Amino acid sequence: MHAASREAFERLIKTLDQGLKESDNAVGNGATTGTELFDVVDVLDQERSLRVAMVDAAATPEQRVELVKTLLSGKVTASTEEIVSAAVSQNWSNSQDFRTGLERLGRRALLRSAEAQGQLERVEEELFSLARILERESELELLLSDRAAAVDDRRDLLAKVLYGKVSSVTEALALQAVGRARKAPVDLLDDLCQEAASLNGYEVARVTSAGPLSEEQKASLSEKLHKIYGRKIAVHTEVDSSLLGGAVVRVGDEVIDGSTAGKLERMRRSLA
């Protein structure tokens, strides 16, 4: 996002969070608002002229709010309409930033719903696990990323895969990740995992080890990474026996390769 859009988005985050905090049903309102914001984004993806009209600098904020009322009144809850109205009242750098802002607000609303249920950590873990499954199941990822197929068909496919296996919030977040052209579903799921961790005050560490790590080992690693990075780290693990031993740790764009395979490769290069 550009500077003006970032400022607008930060103000909207405060509006959304405050509204859910004051709600007597943060779980239900968060889930409904998030889902409805995704529906609005789907419409904006199909109607570029509408997206442009909602951030038209030639129109007054009041005129843009009136457009929102005309389109959404009676079709979404009052809280969703209020968020979209607040969004069009802001100054955005471009219409794409506006659309992205609404999508991110939808994600945050759903994560706040999970937080209110005490399920935020579970959602974080499920998102990480789902991303790893898609990495392993390349055929499934290709089907979900196939732009020649209708978005609804791809989402139906993923819904069948997820049915009864994850929380409702995880399912809603995962389904909205399908059909977003700018990123592959795996990358969006990793972004969502990090967003969930951030709400808990953590950053995600992706740890690939030659064998399963015990809870004690994960806790010890989390503490060591905390000392290195100066912030709390949520450790998510996966097993890759080809590493032979040790582990590879990824935090953001940084990689710490302490695997046996990595050490052997570095030794081979030094001798070449």
UniProtKB/Swiss-Prot annotation:
Keywords: ATP synthesis, Cell membrane, CF(1), Hydrogen ion transport, Ion transport, Membrane, Transport. The keyword Cell membrane applies. InterPro entries: ATP_synth_OSCP/delta_N_sf, ATPase_OSCP/d_CS, ATPase_OSCP/dsu. It is found in: Cell membrane. It holds the Pfam family OSCP. It is a peripheral membrane protein. GO terms for cellular component: plasma membrane; proton-transporting ATP synthase complex. It comes from the Bacteria. Gene3D superfamilies: N-terminal domain of the delta subunit of the F1F0-ATP synthase. One of its GO terms (molecular function) is proton-transporting ATP synthase activity, rotational mechanism. The keyword Iron does not apply. F(1)F(0) ATP synthase produces ATP from ADP in the presence of a proton or sodium gradient. F-type ATPases consist of two structural domains, F(1) containing the extramembraneous catalytic core and F(0) containing the membrane proton channel, linked together by a central stalk and a peripheral stalk. During catalysis, ATP synthesis in the catalytic domain of F(1) is coupled via a rotary mechanism of the central stalk subunits to proton translocation. PANTHER family: ATP SYNTHASE DELTA CHAIN. F-type ATPases have 2 components, F(1) - the catalytic core - and F(0) - the membrane proton channel. F(1) has five subunits: alpha(3), beta(3), gamma(1), delta(1), epsilon(1). F(0) has three main subunits: a(1), b(2) and c(10-14). The alpha and beta chains form an alternating ring which encloses part of the gamma chain. F(1) is attached to F(0) by a central stalk formed by the gamma and epsilon chains, while a peripheral stalk is formed by the delta and b chains. Belongs to the ATPase delta chain family. This is ATP synthase subunit delta. It comes from Corynebacterium urealyticum (strain ATCC 43042 / DSM 7109).
